[in-house]
UniProtKB/Swiss-Prot annotation:
UniProt tissue specificity: Expressed in liver.
Superkingdom field: Eukaryota
Free-text note on domains in this protein's UniProt record: The reactive center loop (RCL) extends out from the body of the protein and directs binding to the target protease. The protease cleaves the serpin at the reactive site within the RCL, establishing a covalent linkage between the serpin reactive site and the active site of the protease. The resulting inactive serpin-protease complex is highly stable.
Family named by the database record: Belongs to the serpin family.
Signal sequence annotation: 1-24
Annotated site residues (Reactive bond) in this chain: 377-378
Protein keywords: Glycoprotein, Protease inhibitor, Pyrrolidone carboxylic acid, Serine protease inhibitor, Signal
GO molecular function: serine-type endopeptidase inhibitor activity
Official protein name in the record: Alpha-1-antitrypsin-like protein CM55-ST
Organism from which the protein derives: Tamias sibiricus
Amino acid sequence: MPSSISWGLLLLAALSCLGPGSLAQDAQETEASKQDQEHPASHRIAPHLAEFALSFYRVLARQSNTTNIFFSPVSIATALAMLSLGTKGDTHTQILEGLDFNLTEMAEADIHQGFQNLLQTLNRPNTQLQLTSGNGLFIDRNLKLLDKFLEDVKSLYHSEAFSTNFTNTQEARQQINSYVEKGTQGKIVELLKELDRDTVLALVNYIFFKGKWKQPFNEEQTREKDFHVDEATTVRVPMMNRLGMFHLHHCSTLASWVLQMDYLGNATAIFLLPDKGKMQHLEDTVTTEILTKFLKNRQTTKSQLYFPKVSISGTYDLKDVLSSLGITKVFSSEADLSGVTEEAPLSVSKALHKAVLDIDEEGTEAAGGTVLGNIRSTLRYEVIFDRPFLVVIYEHHTKSPLFVGKVVNPTQQ
C-alpha cells in the first residue's frame, strides 16, 4: 500500500424532463402540507441546500456567460455530506460550512438525518414521476475502511459498497461507469474518462429524474424559430407553443418573467426569463426567499407561451468550484480523512459531476387539455422564451432544489 493515497470522488446527476404543462392545484398543496408533517428532517436542511445551489450557480456563472449551466445541488451536496462522515478537523468544518451548514445552529446528527430522510423520500415509488438516486462506494480490495464509516454511509446514505480492483484502472473505470449508466437509465455514459493510478476509493452519487408535464404541448404545433443567444448570435430551435392557463407573471424585482410548470407527481420547474439585457441583474438579485415566495404565491393567467425544446448537459470538475466556496483541505495533502481509514493518508484527487437536461412536448396524453375552447378569460400575455433563461426544478415533498441551470444556447451540447 503506497504511503500517499488519493480518493477519487465522483458525483453526477441525470435529468430527463419531458413536456411543459400547467401548474399545481389545491390538491397538490394539500398533499404537500401532509408531507410537511411527515418529513421535518429533510425540510430542515432544504433552505441550506437552496443557498448552496445559488452559491454554486454563481461560481459557474462567473466563470463563463456564454455556456449552458446545469447541475444537481442535491447530488453534489449528498456526496459531500456523505464524505464528511469520514473527515475531521478543518477538512470536516470546511465541507459542512461550504454546504451552508452552521454547527452552532444545527446539530450534525440532524444534518445527516435530513439527508437520510431526503434520500428515502426521493426513492419512494411514484407511478407518475420517475425519480431515483443512489450512492456507490467503490473500495480497493486491499483497503480496510473503518467499520463506523462503512456503517454510517450504508445506514444514513443507503450506499452500496463494491469491492474494486483499482490496480487495473481500466477494469475499475468500467465498473464505475457501468454503475452510473445503469442508475441513470443510459443517460450518462462514460462519465469517467480516466482513473488516477493511486486511487483506492471512489464515491459515486447519481440522481435520475424523468417527468411529464400535466398538460403537454402538442407536437404538431412545434415550429422552427429564432433563439437569440446574444446580440451577435442567433440559432434556429424547435419552438413549442401552447395557449393556456399558466402560472406566469412579471417580477419587477428580478426584471424577469416567472413561469412555473408542474410535472405529474410532486415536482415543479421554475423558469426565469430576464428582460433583454437583464441577465446579470437577475443572477445578482435572485434569492432563495424570492424563489420560495414564487412557489407559495402563484398567479394564473391566460397566455400564449412559446418555449424551446432543450437538450443540454453540464460536466464539471468540482475541485475548482468547491474551492471557491471554501472547500479546499479535502483536495490537498492536508486533508484529514482519518475517519475513513487508518491505513494511510487520503485526499480527494478527482471530483466530477455531470447532469443532463431534456425538455420536450411529451405528456401522458398526446394533446389532452391543450385546447382552450371553453376558457373565456382575455389573453393577457404572450411570452416567448427566445433568449437565455434560468431553470430551477423543485421536489415538493422535500422542498429541495433537484436541479439548477441556465440555458444560453439550446443547441449547445
